[in-house]
């Protein structure tokens, strides 16, 4: 999460995740965010970046993969870009949301990692919610995850930004996906369970599965 490496826009609709016997999908969910949306480190939605890196092709390393299996009437577009702050994510909203009915907005950990103001990051998230609603989309926000490699210094900032996200959600009447609480280790508050993180920064495949199956809900 801390390395600002990827700046290419990744837009990939997950194809065929539900098999041939599932109902026709009628709702497109655009997911906009940083590496947590992208599926790092196991997946990157940009095929050119996968070719450059030589890895990142494990589709199961996305919460959207598991959410689509749990909700076969939905189709997901992955617009996650590794290392981006909320201001950078916001610039990609219109392209990501094109043709979608639902928009999931996720971001903020790279703002913290780069020493950016929490209030400024929250304002960026607010503008994305407002823009999504103006486009006629159902919008939902996502909490920041615990950050094992940033613990304990980053955790108070993560919790504070999550508080701001929930306040924004109440003001804008949009839901929040409980990413933090879903992956927080009850025995080690402020951190993800070891089995749920691949590198201390991002979820493992099992962590992404929990986010897709337990945390995701339609707005």
Question: Predicted regions span which residues?
Answer:
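Bacterial N-terminal signal peptides
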Residues: 7-15
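Serine-esterase "nucleophile elbow" of acetyl-processing enzymes
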Residues: 17-79, 92-99
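Structural recognition of the beta-strand scaffold that forms the well-ordered cores
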Residues: 29-32, 37, 75-80, 102-107, ...
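Oxyanion-hole/transition-state-stabilizing segment in secreted/luminal serine hydrolases
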Residues: 31, 38-45, 85-122, 145-149
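Active-site segments of SGNH/GDSL-like serine hydrolases
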Residues: 106-110, 128-160
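Charged helix-capping and loop-helix junction motifs
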Residues: 118-126, 157-162
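Catalytic His-Asp segment of secreted/periplasmic serine-dependent ester chemistry enzymes
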Residues: 146-219
């Amino acid at each position: 999460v801390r390395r600002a490496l990827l700046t290419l826009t990744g837009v990939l609709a997950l194809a065929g995740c539900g098999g041939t016997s599932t109902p026709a999908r009628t709702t497109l969910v655009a997911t906009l965010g940083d590496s947590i949306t992208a599926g790092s480190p196991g997946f990157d939605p940009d095929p050119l970046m996968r070719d450059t890196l030589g890895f990142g092709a494990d589709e199961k390393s996305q919460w959207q993969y598991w959410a689509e299996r749990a909700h076969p009437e939905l189709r997901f577009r992955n617009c996650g870009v590794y290392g981006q702050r909320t201001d950078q994510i916001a610039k990609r909203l219109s392209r990501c949301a094109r043709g979608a009915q639902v928009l999931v907005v996720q971001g903020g950990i790279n703002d913290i990692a780069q020493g950016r103001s929490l209030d400024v990051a929250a304002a960026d998230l607010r503008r994305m919610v407002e823009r999504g609603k103006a486009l006629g989309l159902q919008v939902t926000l996502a909490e920041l995850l615990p950050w094992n490699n940033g613990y304990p210094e980053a955790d108070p900032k993560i919790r504070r930004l999550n508080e701001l996200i929930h306040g924004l959600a109440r003001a804008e009447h949009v839901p929040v996906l409980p990413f933090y609480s879903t992956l927080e280790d009850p025995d080690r508050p402020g951190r993800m369970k070891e089995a749920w993180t691949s590198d201390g920064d991002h979820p493992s495949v099992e962590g992404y599965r929990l986010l897709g199956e337990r945390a995701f809900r339609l707005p």
